[in-house]
């Protein structure tokens, strides 16, 4: 089996029918013409935010990570492992793709521990066992994995989806693409930066050009590139016609170098 490709979905993608249609059409095209197995990893911040708003619950973030109190983890699990995951499975079904919905704890695919007590039920993801997902891939299934995990003590944890995707890529020896709303990392003039090193990223963070959630994304991509020992791409789902080329390893967004 070829080494898999993990496509991490983020941003408002889950909220946009047009975006999902583009993505799944590209996945169908890719799967028809390539043997390479694919895995989807997703968060669903927008789904969680909508639900929290509807329930009048505050959304609090610390350094770009969502604070998850004990009384909110069940709600967030329902939004990510439930609504967001099953929405993606429904789109796969609509496009005749045989998909299986999972969370990080299934088959112990990604090991999760509590990151920081101050953040509550927020997990740190580390590589686990490739056995379950490899079995699914060998049988032609598309695993769709939410970023909810569980500790050895049985505590549910909300994991940053970029970091979850990195841990799963390390588990499977997979390549990784982080798909988001933006076409990559932008410089101070709004122009896409084609390649990024750790030194360049540090410089742009110091200058205030890379901020907030993008800092988490860039650090996750740098961490992924270091962990995996190979480049990681940050790119946009908006240009559907470019997605098959992107899945084939053509740089379309910002390539994070080791």
From Swiss-Prot:
One of its GO terms (molecular function) is ATP binding. Substrate binds at residues 44-45, 66, 158. InterPro entries: AceGlu_kinase-like_sf, AcgluKinase_fam, ArgB, Asp/Glu/Uridylate_kinase, NAGK-NC. It is found in: Cytoplasm. This is Acetylglutamate kinase. CDD domains: AAK_NAGK-NC. ATP binds at residues 181-186, 209-211. NCBIfam families: argB. It catalyses: N-acetyl-L-glutamate + ATP = N-acetyl-L-glutamyl 5-phosphate + ADP. GO terms for cellular component: cytoplasm. The lineage of its organism: Bacteria, Pseudomonadati, Pseudomonadota, Gammaproteobacteria, Enterobacterales. Belongs to the acetylglutamate kinase family. ArgB subfamily. It comes from Shigella dysenteriae serotype 1 (strain Sd197). One of its GO terms (biological process) is arginine biosynthetic process via ornithine. The record marks 8, 217 as: Transition state stabilizer. Signal peptide: none annotated. Catalyzes the ATP-dependent phosphorylation of N-acetyl-L-glutamate. It is an enzyme of class 2 (transferase).
């Amino acid at each position: 089996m070829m080494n898999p490709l993990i496509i991490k979905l983020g941003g408002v993608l889950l909220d946009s029918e047009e975006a999902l249609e583009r993505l799944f059409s590209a996945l169908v095209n890719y799967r028809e013409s390539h043997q390479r197995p694919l895995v989807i990893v997703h968060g669903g911040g927008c789904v969680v935010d909508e639900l929290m708003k509807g329930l009048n619950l505050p959304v609090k973030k610390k350094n770009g990570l969502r604070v998850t109190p004990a009384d909110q983890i069940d709600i967030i699990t329902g939004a990510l492992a439930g609504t967001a995951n099953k929405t993606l499975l429904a789109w796969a079904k609509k496009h005749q793709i045989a998909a299986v919905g999972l969370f990080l704890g299934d088959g112990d695919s990604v090991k999760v521990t509590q990151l920081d007590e101050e953040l509550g039920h927020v997990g740190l993801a580390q590589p686990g066992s490739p056995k379950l997902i490899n079995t699914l891939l060998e049988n032609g299934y598309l695993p769709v994995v939410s970023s909810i995990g569980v500790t050895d003590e049985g505590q549910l944890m909300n994991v940053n989806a970029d970091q979850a995707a990195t841990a799963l890529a390390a588990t499977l020896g997979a390549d990784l693409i982080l798909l988001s709303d933006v076409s990559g990392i932008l410089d101070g003039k709004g122009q896409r930066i084609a390649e990024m090193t750790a030194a360049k990223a540090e410089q742009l963070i110091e200058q205030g050009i890379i901020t907030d959630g993008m800092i988490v994304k860039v650090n996750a991509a740098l961490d992924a590139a270091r962990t995996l020992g190979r480049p990681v791409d940050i790119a946009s789902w908006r240009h559907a016609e470019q997605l098959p080329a992107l899945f084939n390893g053509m740089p379309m967004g910002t390539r994070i170098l080791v």
